[in-house]
Amino acid sequence: MKYKHLFFDLDHTLWDFDANAKIALTEIYSFFNLEELGVKPFAEFYPHYLHHNDILWNRYHKGFITGEELKWKRMWRTLLEFKIADEKLAKEMSAYFMEILPVKNLLFPHTIEILDYLREKKYGLHLITNGFEKTQWLKLRNSGLDPYFKHIITSEASNSLKPCKEIFDYAMNKAGAFLSDSIMLGDNLDADIKGAMNAGMDCIFVNHINVSTELKPTYTITHLRELENIF
């Protein structure tokens, strides 16, 4: 068995961030009466949020903004799309979002089944996530994922972000693993795939949405059940 340790990303890989965020944002839309403020319809509000969230996460990954800026500025920029320049409202929406998002528990299809399968085969299962420490732990507990992982490495605990090599080195040390017997599984081409490749680690691109890329990960899958063909 070449691999002994499997390091998973969480958001967009196992935990369905977009689906869970949509539910949470629907609640925010209603709670803050955004329709009455001119933020309408929700069908426009939601894609604007996803757009700005992606941009700001990318900036956060590169160290251009802080986690706190990411949290409220994604709301702020979304409101600006509707000509609402209300920083106080954006920060209140952000705080409420961070409170309700982690209790959502939608996972990608067959997440639990594949984790059961891998655990049964005695692989060491771990997480490497750029998500916020408290939030990620809540997501894991509320979705029933926490018992599967021996080590949960967050950017806050390691003081480093994927794709930086330091977070992968920290993960190896924490798990007592070696790059040669470990593999990274994730959806983000920059953070997970480039990060692992630059660290000298094999990787699996979990390509749920069929993104094209010139990168050459060790494996590419479009569905978690395909891991049964690898391990």
Positions of PLM-derived features:
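Asp-based, Mg2+/Mn2+-dependent phosphohydrolase catalytic module
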Residues: 1-6, 19, 116-119, 128, ...
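Generic recognition of short, well-ordered alpha-helical interface segments
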Residues: 70-74, 106, 113, 166, ...
